[in-house]
Amino acid sequence: MYVEMIDETGQVSEDIKKQTLDLLEFAAQKTGKENKEMAVTFVTNERSHELNLEYRDTDRPTDVISLEYKPEVDISFDEEDLAENPELAEMLEDFDSYIGELFISIDKAKEQAEEYGHSYEREMGFLAVHGFLHINGYDHYTPEEEKEMFSLQEEILTAYGLKRQ
């Protein structure tokens, strides 16, 4: 998995960046998304608020904003066409590899770590996995969806070693 990481705040340690990258690669392996690309941007509450207004019509900052990339065109070819044209097959693979981007508010992560009584590292890991699952089609609008997403989220975090304290 390729992850572009951007720290707009200038406050995220190399350890947190490495943990985020390692954890996203681990989550990608667990979910069969190893050959995908995404971006993670660390932001302030102010920037999170701006992004929420722009993309979600929500007038407040949130801990993580997940923007799933969905191409506006449906490109499909039959197997025979792809077998005859390997360059086309490779182009389609590249086109399909970008899954989206996450914006993680470091301010919210700090607030929530304190509120929930666990480490900042655990909260940052939780937000990365939560956002990753969202851009891969998981959601929690219904009780069934919530159960599926949250159990997978906890399974990934626990297997990685970021348990609730």
UniProtKB/Swiss-Prot annotation:
Gene3D superfamilies given in the database record: Metalloproteases ('zincins'), catalytic domain (3.40.390.30)
GO biological process: rRNA processing
Binding site for Zn(2+): 130, 134, 140
Pfam families attached to this UniProt entry: YbeY (PF02130)
Record EC number: 3.1.-.-
Coiled coil location: none
Job description of the protein: Single strand-specific metallo-endoribonuclease involved in late-stage 70S ribosome quality control and in maturation of the 3' terminus of the 16S rRNA.
Origin organism lineage: Bacteria, Bacillati, Bacillota, Bacilli, Lactobacillales
HAMAP family: Endoribonucl_YbeY
UniProt keyword annotation of Cytoplasm present: yes
Compartments reported by the entry: Cytoplasm
Cofactor(s), names only, from the UniProt record: Zn(2+)
Organism whose genome encodes this protein: Streptococcus agalactiae serotype V (strain ATCC BAA-611 / 2603 V/R)
UniProtKB keywords: Cytoplasm, Endonuclease, Hydrolase, Metal-binding, Nuclease, Ribosome biogenesis, rRNA processing, Zinc
Family: Belongs to the endoribonuclease YbeY family.
Entry's cofactor comment: Binds 1 zinc ion.
PROSITE patterns, per the entry: UPF0054
GO terms assigned for molecular function: metalloendopeptidase activity; RNA endonuclease activity; zinc ion binding
Protein name: Endoribonuclease YbeY
Keyword check for Transmembrane: no
CC terms in the record's Gene Ontology section: cytoplasm
